[in-house]
Regions:
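Long, low-complexity, intrinsically disordered N-terminal extensions of eukaryotic proteins, enriched
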Residues: 2-3, 22, 30
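Bacterial N-terminal signal peptides
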Residues: 12-25
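Low-complexity, acidic/polar, glycine-enriched regions of mature
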Residues: 26-241
Length: 241
């Protein structure tokens, strides 16, 4: 029985980390009808190809948003950084499919569904400050409008290009599209296979500027957002989900 190696691991964004799912196990359970992605996929997303593969009897896995999580830690910088806050941005709405026998996976994150500074995630990140509700709302608004330009670029996309390694530890090469720019990177993964699903987790650090994103800065840079952000992810996908 072949340990399903080719799948994915991110974002970011984003992401990113989403990439992970590609590592689905090829020793899949019986093929069941494939449910459509919830919430609407982006234009051009190859959902039809995955659904056709499932109809042909091939093992196709769908990402389970309720069991998946992508978290991005955004940290402050500048001479007056102590007056600002670090932030945690999360997606609970990762969508997409994995086709293990082709070593293929395509994932997406809707940026307008990102949430900011959930208390539990702030605690996990070790952030001790507690921004007010107004500060959180302002951070989210600035992120979507000024930083990510979410109306113009509403999705972050991940496409798996290959997976290397055996056993629990793998490395996925993925193309991430964010803010209209596509970058390819290697993402380390930890893979846990189960009877009817797989969980893939990992983390990476990337520069916002690599995607043409300009981190927010005020007071001449005295308070600003660091260019580098840390992304950690846990992606679960199952057959016929």
């Amino acid at each position: 029985m072949k340990d399903a190696a080719q799948r994915l691991g991110v974002w970011a964004l984003v992401l990113i980390a989403l990439v992970a799912v590609a590592v689905l196990a090829a020793c899949a359970p019986e093929v069941r009808p494939l449910a459509p992605v919830e919430g609407g996929a982006p234009a051009g997303f190859p959902e039809r190809e995955y659904r056709q593969a499932a109809a042909d009897g091939r093992a196709v896995y769908r990402v389970d948003p309720a069991r998946s999580l992508v978290v991005i830690e955004v940290r402050r910088a500048g001479s007056l950084a102590r007056l600002g806050h670090d932030h945690v941005v999360a997606s609970h709405d990762v969508g997409g499919y994995v086709l293990p026998d082709a070593g293929r996976a395509d994932l997406y994150v809707r940026l307008d569904r990102l949430v900011v500074d959930e208390p539990d995630l702030r605690a996990e990140a070790g952030f001790e400050t507690k921004p007010s509700a107004d500060a959180i709302a302002g951070t989210r608004r600035n992120m979507l409008e000024r930083v990510l330009e979410a109306e113009r670029y509403p999705f972050a996309l991940v496409s798996v290009k290959g997976v290397r390694g055996e056993g629990v530890s793998r490395v996925a090469t993925v193309a991430i599209t964010l803010h209209g720019a596509t970058r390819t990177m290697d993402v380390p993964l930890e893979v846990e296979s189960r009877a009817a699903s797989i969980e893939v987790s990992g983390e990476l650090t990337f520069a916002q500027s690599d995607f043409g994103i300009v981190p927010l800065s005020i007071l001449g840079g005295a308070i600003e957002v660091q260019d580098a952000v840390r992304l950690r992810f846990r992606i679960e996908a199952g057959s016929g989900a």
